[in-house]
Amino acid sequence: TVTISGGTITEASGGYMAAGIGSGYQGLGTVTIEGDAVIKNAQGGEAGAGIGSGTYGDSNILIRGNAVIENAESSANGAGIGSGQGDLYLDGDGMVIDPTVGNVTIEGNAKIENAKSGYGGSGIGGGAIGIGNVIIRGNAQIGNATGGEEGAGIGGGALGTRDVTIE
């Protein structure tokens, strides 16, 4: 579990399959960014989220208060903000889908600018083969959420499903 309640973090980078801020490979937990926290340039490694989970990791992300996030990015298959990449493989009986699971809630006066992913991931939501929900409410502001090829700006990544609610 990671909680950031204030201050400024710049240049947080995850290695291969890890998030820039959050969990590593197969990590579980919650990432909360709140208060007057400012995050600039959170970069996930390939298949990891910029902010959220690494590959095969499940996490919930809560961004609230007056938090500001600028430039959260996954190089490929993870979300800019959300889950990393899940798995798809052959078993003796057929295809097995093992998704990452994560929910993203953005609320209060939180502001996000430039959340993006490379191939397969979403800007905000799921990585490739990821499931969960995105909830945006209150006075939250989002500018420039960009998914990679086969990924949504806000929603699911490739082969993933997401419910998006704006309240």
Regions found by a protein language model. Give the residues of each.
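Beta-rich catalytic cores
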Residues: 17, 47, 77, 120, ...
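Surface-exposed loop/turn motifs in large extracellular/passenger domains
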Residues: 1-14, 21-43, 51-73, 81-116, ...
